[in-house]
Amino acid sequence: MFALVVPPYPVNVAVQTISPTKYCFQFENRVQAKEFTLFLTDIQKFTPGYNAAIYLAYQPFTDWKYLGFINSNKPSIICKIPSETLDNNNNNNNNNNNNNNINNGFINNINSIIPTEIIQIGISIETDLEIQSKPPIEQQQQQQQQQQQQQNTSSTSINNFIKTEEFKQVAFKLCDNLVNYILSFSTSNNTVPSSSINKWYENFQKKLKNDQLDFLK
């Protein structure tokens, strides 16, 4: 009923029946394949309104990632293989997420010696309503990336605002220092010599060179 293709291996039809609604493939990913294809071998036997939900897990097969589904209208699918590192990192963050960390009855049902780097592909027969209630792991990762980008954008905007406010404060203090300096040269006629501006600028350059701009802090 099901067939699995993991490049460059040949087609695998040795699906193991766990229960009337649970099936499982397993393979050793020696070539570090990035994706696999799963398809129905007999579409007519697949009941309309039901789907084959596809899950993937690494040892110890307690963190099942939902990857997508196939049915009579969609008899095949190409799924990306999530990295084991990514699975382990997400495990602690998703313990309470039923869409992301699912035990579908595949655990401990394969009576064989489990080599290292083994991957299990679990297949669970589920209704349309069950399928609609859970997004695939790839879609969840995209949503997480979008949320992270939004957070980064928000942080950048806040930092830019802070820098703008700091610049305004420095500009105000600089102008205030200039005005006070010039007014110190004012005469009884309320005039100031133009040379006072040049003197202020020369003093400012000296302070800037010697890092003596405490009045701007």
Swiss-Prot record:
One of its GO terms (cellular component) is cytosol. This is Protein OPI10 homolog. GO terms for biological process: protein import into nucleus. It holds the Pfam family Hikeshi-like_N. Belongs to the OPI10 family. It comes from the Eukaryota. GO terms for molecular function: nuclear import signal receptor activity.
